[in-house]
Amino acid sequence: MIIDGVKISETKMERLKNEIEKIKNTGINPKMKIILIGNDYGSVVYSKAKMRRGSKLGIDVDLDRYDSISREDLIKLLKRYSQSDDIHGIMIETPVPGINYYDVVNEIPFYKDVDGMTSYNLGNLYLKNEFIAPATARAVVDILDYINIKSGNVAIINRSPVVGRPLSMMLLNRDFTVTVCHSRTVNINEITRSSDIVVVAVGKPNFLDRSYVSDKNIIIDVGINYLNGKTCGDADYENIKDYVNAITPVPGGVGPVTATDIFENFINGLKYQIKG
C-alpha cells in the first residue's frame, strides 16, 4: 500500500480552513511570522511553501529574510514579535547560521511557537499534553491514525529533538512500543525487520534498502534529499515498495502532512491567545 500524504493533508486542510473562517468572523486577522536567515535552499523552498499553504487557509504568513543577523538582534526581533498582539505565531527557519537555534527559540512564547520546539512545548509531551507538538512528529502520528494503526512495535531511526525524541514520546503516549535507533545502535536491520512500523529520518538517500525491511513493515519515510536533480527520501522506495506492507513516498508522503500540521499548531496557539 502506498500511503497518500497529499490526501491526508487535504482532508486536514479543509477542517483547519473552517476553523480559520470562524476565527476571522470574530474580527481577528490571523498572522504568522517566518524568520529566514541566510540562503539555505531547502529553507527558502519550505518558507515559500508555508506562505502558499497559509494563504489557502486564510492566514497571513509574512516572511522576514536576512542575509545574516546577530544573536542579540535576533532575540530583540523575537521579543518584539512575541509582544505584538497582531502576530499570533512565530517560526525560525533552520539552519540559523552562526546561532544556536535552541539558545534563542525559548524567546518565543509557547503559544506562538508553531514549530513546537520551545522547552515548554517539548516538555509537555512527557505529560501527554500535545497542545503544540513538533510538526514532523505530529505528521507521523497523523499518518498512523489515518491508516488506523493504534498499536505495535516501532523502530525510529533518528534521535533528534525535531523527530526521534518527540515522536518516541508521542507514540509511547499512545501505547506503542518504541525502539529509538541511531548511529551507534548495533544490528539496526534486525530491529527494523522485526518491527511493525519503521520511521526513518537519517538524511541519506536510499539508506533503507531491502536488507532493512520485511513484508510486515509500515515504512514512514521522513527524509528529504536531493539526488540527481530529484527529490527522494531515506528509503530506497522503488526497490522496497513491493516488499513491505505499506510505505510513504517522497515527495507526497510525510512532507504535505507536516506542512499542514504547522498550521494546526498555529491554530491551537491562536485559540489559546483568544481565550486569554
Curated annotation (Swiss-Prot):
E.C. number: 1.5.1.5, 3.5.4.9
Keywords of the record: Amino-acid biosynthesis, Histidine biosynthesis, Hydrolase, Methionine biosynthesis, Multifunctional enzyme, NADP, One-carbon metabolism, Oxidoreductase, Purine biosynthesis
Q: Which CDD domains match?
A: NAD_bind_m-THF_DH_Cyclohyd (cd01080)
A Gene Ontology cellular component where this protein is annotated is: cytosol
Q: Where does NADP(+) bind?
A: 158-160, 183, 224
A Pfam short name: THF_DHG_CYH
Share an example GO biological-process annotation for this protein: tetrahydrofolate interconversion
Q: Which InterPro entries match?
A: Aminoacid_DH-like_N_sf, FolD_Thplmales, NAD(P)-bd_dom_sf, THF_DH/CycHdrlase, THF_DH/CycHdrlase_cat_dom, THF_DH/CycHdrlase_NAD-bd_dom
* Catalytic function, reaction form: (6R)-5,10-methylene-5,6,7,8-tetrahydrofolate + NADP(+) = (6R)-5,10-methenyltetrahydrofolate + NADPH; (6R)-5,10-methenyltetrahydrofolate + H2O = (6R)-10-formyltetrahydrofolate + H(+)
Q: In which pathway does it act?
A: One-carbon metabolism; tetrahydrofolate interconversion
- Cite the GO molecular-function annotations of the record: methenyltetrahydrofolate cyclohydrolase activity; methylenetetrahydrofolate dehydrogenase (NADP+) activity
Subunit structure of this chain's protein: Homodimer.
Concerning its family, UniProt says:
Belongs to the tetrahydrofolate dehydrogenase/cyclohydrolase family.
Function summary: Catalyzes the oxidation of 5,10-methylenetetrahydrofolate to 5,10-methenyltetrahydrofolate and then the hydrolysis of 5,10-methenyltetrahydrofolate to 10-formyltetrahydrofolate.
Q: What is this protein called?
A: Bifunctional protein FolD
